[in-house]
Amino acid sequence: MEFTIAEELAKNQKSISVAEFFEKNRQILGFDSAPRSLITTVKEAVDNALDACEEAGILPDILVQIERTGQDYVTVIIEDNGPGIIKEQIPKVFAKLLYGSRFHALKQSRGQQGIGISAAVLYAQMTAGKQTKILSKTGSGNPAHYYELMINTSTNEPDILKDEIRDWFRPHGTQIELEMKAAYVKGRRQSISEYLKATAIVNPHARITLIEPDGNEEVFERATDKMPKPAEEILPHPEGIELGTLMKMLHYTERQKLAPFLRYSFCKIGLLTAEEICKASGLDPEIDPHALGRHEARKLIEAFEKVKIMSPPTDCLSPIGEELIYRGLEKETNVDFIATSTRKPAVYSGNPFVVEVGLAYGGKLPKEEKISIMRFANRVPLLYQQGGCVTTHAVEDIKWKQYGLNQPGGGVPVGPAILLIHVASINVPFTSESKDAIADIPVIKDEIDLAIKDVARKLKHYLSKQSNLKKRREKEIIITKVLPKMAVKVANILEKDVPDINPVVAKIMGNLLVHRKVKRNEDGTADVVIKVKNFGTSAYAFKVHEMLPCTILGAKPEPKVVTLGNDYDYVWDISAAAGSSKVLSYRIESTTDKELGTFPDLVVEGLEEELVTGAKAFKGV
């Protein structure tokens, strides 16, 4: 009886394809709601476009267009100027899950599993019942190949519904068009616009255009023409390798001896290190790796831990860099202060990684709300599961009050700030297949903590400086109200002209004094002398701008001249130690008394206005 039941059960047992599995478990890949399904689709297509362009050395120019095709349906069109895809590969790239080129590559990349874009194709055919349209071209002399595809979920193979050649204006690139059940939302952090804005910040070399369903066009311009440093593929590192993985490597290696196997299968193992590992494991360097079993593999794992092996190389990573993080934040935010920090590469379980942080503060950011945390992994925004991410946990564990931000009740601080956190690695440890959050790996959390504290210290310094400038400003307002009245009264008593009070104000405030004196000569020319005196206690480096509608003669020292239409901007670079003075002089021809009295204000670039008396001032970048 029991045998009969077992036989009956056996009849119902069969294997399923990976496509069938994801068909029934689409939420695993981020297709669990209408708004999120659209964001996931755009994310996967944009990731592919950026990766393809970077691998080909092409500055990315990406178009994302969303059209409403029904009450609950949208059509998504994503187009790029990448290298294109050869004809034979198009069906498999878009309509076969777990098909890709990066799964076994140990280097930083946005996508690895070969699931993303084909999962979007699967979701589109499940919810709208329509095929996905692909157009791709590999060069100006080559035809554009057009496909209409669906996925056969029983076999995880592409069903080709249409295959033809078409004309396309682009010299090279790829376009994908999908119709699906989804919702386009605006005005919140988890939206297409915010996702693309975040993508533009950490990919400042890309130009991204969004055309919304209402026809509104939003362009995220590139901030640099410099391509990211390409990530180089590396061999596995012995640290953190698992027993089963090592046994598989031993079984399938082409090497016939253990020592060469170690040298050429792992990074940072040379001849001497390989011999040390063999000695520590008690294994003969000449033994055939294929003859080693589980017991010997375990000995090798133990030897890896005993022998000092150099950390893996970091050229497999492509960090954004502090300068480009600054440019990205500056381009997409309107703030008063930006600080950045890039940590040195570190290692977890043999995987190199690097942490980068940017902090933007002030401007029109809300003061009474929690700061905005922008999370990224390998230059890809993470929009969901913020509370379950190591980046958020690191932010919450910092005592922000000592850096100038309120933290009522602990957790994420409150204030007008955006905190950008980027983790780049050959293997980012996500908490799930949907890649929404990074796992709590202690060494990664430590690096995030150190990077955040670095920018937080810079923020503290900035806020302290702003507080001091505010006090100076308030003091100067009082002085400039009182001194003129005193000067007028004293001048009346002594029956003399009212003196210039700027030198007195500068001396009391400890400011930089800039004073221009013009003397008319009998021949119609005029001599101009600009005196600069530093009454402060610090050395200053700055520029003095004199903007005039005429050329000058005999300038000492010689300024840099910038033509501005019919006017000229004369610029002197000056360094002034505490208590020192500088003199600038020049002559102008044929001026009337009226013209001499209408000189524009001198401008000091490089110092806050609170530190300068007698001229306009701006800090600059």
UniProtKB/Swiss-Prot annotation:
Record GO biological process: DNA topological change
Catalytic activity reported: ATP-dependent breakage, passage and rejoining of double-stranded DNA
Alphabetically ordered keywords of this record: ATP-binding, DNA-binding, Isomerase, Nucleotide-binding, Topoisomerase
Chain sites annotated for binding ATP: N48, D80, S101, R102, G111, Q112, Q113, G114, I115, G116, I117, S118, K435
Purpose: Relaxes both positive and negative superturns and exhibits a strong decatenase activity.
Protein's name according to its UniProt entry: Type 2 DNA topoisomerase 6 subunit B
GO function terms (MF aspect): ATP binding; DNA binding; DNA topoisomerase type II (double strand cut, ATP-hydrolyzing) activity
Family statement: Belongs to the TOP6B family.
EC number: 5.6.2.2
